[in-house]
């Protein structure tokens, strides 16, 4: 229940969405500001961050508000229920968690927070202006399509269709916008740095950006070349994320000073909840026996099939006490023939090539099944000169797969540091593979 008379008694209400406000948070904030002002409530929507979605600002609002906190501020929250060191006088939300907000609190499981606010306005007889009605449609589609929200309700989407007819909205435009597709710009560097955020990693930082697309068409080499120039002593890595909302895949490209990694996952992942925590664990990992200890603690058995690393992954695992309890076995399959003898299907090698993500995946699955282990690691690639038996090989390009649980998405590793010795490259590869396993086990 919202007590309008009580809210009118405040002189400085700040309406705020969650940090790094998404589209729904911003629509909710601007919509509620419009309603409150017309009800005689002194309120202003402000952003907690210095960032605002450029497309949102240019297409719909054309203004930017950054919050400069004052001691006499009171807060009205939209699209979240975080705690603050200032009084909270109310909240609209649409998440399943019920917060301990004692008054002026409405939390309903609707497709978007903006729809919760819109429905409340209708219930008190307030007529929402056409422009904000349109924004609410966009907010509902953004949450329901782009992120496959579990909060999406069929009745809300039916309402959206009714509003689209009312306002003569182009359905294709609405749906495409609902997918959250990143608008192309002529400036490629600006395009792939959409949504830049910085994350602390000890005394260093990781930077990340993302784009949302409906088809994979971006040039990997161009992305790496652009982001490599951003790597410094302070910024140790850049995590670029490309979400394909049609194929429902997420491509992750992690660029560091010496190498970059590419992985495509067969589902849409959250940057904040899924990707960045794993990246931070990966970059923080040390080859100090942690993996062996984790496998022992979790009672997980592992097997490896190694080509270019020549058994060094298994060797590193057994450098630490207790490895006999978790390492089931290891195969060094340095040639195509030995891979086939070990159980890798000839057709996979012939169709995709021995140096490919498909072959790495096949190696991981094969060794896992052969040794009846919980985890299988497969690795293939070239550290040096072109392999005469495999002329398509590229020096410094490695593929590895880790078959664990029901999901396995192979990773491409490319070294970008010239003149790195074969020995150093081999050990670095082992460290990277074990760090990847560490991040998987830590989830």
Where do the protein language model's features map onto the residues?
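Short alpha-helical segments enriched in small residues
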Residues: 284-443
């Amino acid at each position: 229940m919202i007590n309008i008379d009580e809210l009118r008694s405040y002189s400085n209400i700040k309406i705020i969405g969650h940090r790094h406000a998404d589209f729904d948070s911003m629509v909710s904030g601007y919509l509620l500001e419009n309603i409150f002002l017309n009800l005689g409530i002194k309120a202003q929507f402000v952003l907690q961050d210095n960032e605002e979605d450029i497309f949102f600002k240019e297409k719909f609002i054309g203004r930017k508000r950054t919050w400069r906190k004052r001691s006499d501020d009171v807060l009205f929250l939209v699209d979240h229920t975080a705690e603050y060191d200032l009084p909270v006088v109310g909240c609209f939300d649409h998440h399943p968690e019920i917060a301990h907000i004692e008054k002026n609190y409405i939390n309903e499981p609707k497709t978007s927070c903006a729809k919760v606010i819109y429905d409340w306005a209708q219930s008190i007889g307030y007529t929402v202006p056409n422009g904000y009605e349109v924004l609410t449609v966009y907010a509902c589609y953004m949450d329901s399509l782009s992120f496959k929200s579990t909060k999406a309700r069929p009745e809300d989407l039916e309402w959206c269709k009714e509003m689209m007819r009312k306002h003569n909205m182009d359905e294709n435009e609405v749906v495409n916008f609902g997918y959250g597709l990143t608008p192309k710009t002529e400036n490629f560097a600006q395009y792939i740095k959409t949504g830049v955020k910085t994350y602390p990693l000890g005394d260093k930082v990781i930077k990340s950006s993302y784009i949302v697309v409906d088809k994979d068409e971006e040039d990997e080499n161009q992305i790496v070349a652009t982001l490599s120039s951003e790597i410094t002593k302070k910024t140790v890595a850049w995590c670029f994320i490309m979400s394909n909302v049609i194929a429902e895949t997420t491509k992750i490209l992690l660029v560091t000073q010496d190498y970059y990694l590419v992985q495509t996952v067969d589902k849409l992942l959250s940057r904040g909840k899924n990707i960045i925590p794993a990246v931070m664990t990966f970059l923080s990992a040390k080859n100090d026996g942690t993996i062996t200890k984790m496998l022992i603690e979790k009672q997980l058995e592992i097997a490896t099939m190694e080509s270019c690393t020549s058994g060094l992954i298994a060797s590193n695992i057994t450098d630490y006490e207790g490895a006999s309890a978790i390492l089931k076995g290891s195969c060094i399959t340095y040639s195509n023939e030995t891979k086939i003898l070990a159980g890798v299907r000839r057709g996979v090698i012939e169709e995709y090539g021995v140096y490919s993500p498909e072959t790495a995946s096949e190696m991981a699955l094969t060794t896992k099944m052969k040794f009846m282990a919980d985890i299988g690691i497969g690795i293939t690639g070239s550290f040096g000169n072109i392999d005469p038996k495999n002329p398509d090989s590229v020096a410094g390009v490695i593929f590895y797969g880790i078959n664990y649980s029901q999901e396995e998405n192979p990773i491409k590793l490319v070294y970008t540091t010239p003149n790195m010795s074969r020995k150093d490259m081999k050990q670095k590869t082992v460290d990277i593979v074990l760090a990847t396993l560490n991040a998987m086990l830590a989830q």
